[in-house]
């Protein structure tokens, strides 16, 4: 089991180190909250847990907007890569899977930050050990795993 966990963490590490995949917690929260909140609320939410400062209804709305935005991106990419058909499918399928997991990891980070998780990266920009677990659980929930869903609720 430990070997599988190590391999999975290497996959997450590799994807998270691609350009544009890591979400800067503070920058994301400031950008997401700016149209809806005052500057003091934004500052407090970005330094603390947004869920403690912002109404849950707004957090849920922002979460749905993030999900919809990245679902559209994944769908567009998937459609474009599938158009050529034929031999190109051998290249399109791995590219499609990679971009799907990239979008899913971006959504996972954004949702984690909206609902009050601390920064998943340390001061050097590297994922913390517990971040791998958080991202794995979020991915499991997104993929429909009942076990991950139970772990998430705890």
Which residues fall in each region the model found?
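Terminal, membrane-proximal amphipathic helices
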Residues: 1-80, 105-154
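Conserved phosphate/anionic-ligand binding catalytic regions in large, soluble enzymes, centered on
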Residues: 77-99
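Hydrophobic alpha-helical membrane-embedded segments
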Residues: 91-113
């Amino acid at each position: 089991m430990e070997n599988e966990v190590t391999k999975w963490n290497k996959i997450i590490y590799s994807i998270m180190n691609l350009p544009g995949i890591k979400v800067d917690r503070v920058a994301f929260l400031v950008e997401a909250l700016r149209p809806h909140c005052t500057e003091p609320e934004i500052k407090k939410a970005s330094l603390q847990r947004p869920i403690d400062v912002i109404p849950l209804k707004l957090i849920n709305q922002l979460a749905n907007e993030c999900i919809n935005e990245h679902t559209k991106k994944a769908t567009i990419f998937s459609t474009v890569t599938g158009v050529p058909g034929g031999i190109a499918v051998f290249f399109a399928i791995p590219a499609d899977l990679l971009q799907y997991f990239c979008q899913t990891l971006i959504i996972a980070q954004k949702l984690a930050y909206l609902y009050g998780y601390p920064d998943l990266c340390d001061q050097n920009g590297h994922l913390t050990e517990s971040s791998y677990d958080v991202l794995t659980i979020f991915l499991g929930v997104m993929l429909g795993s009942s076990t991950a869903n139970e772990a998430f609720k705890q």
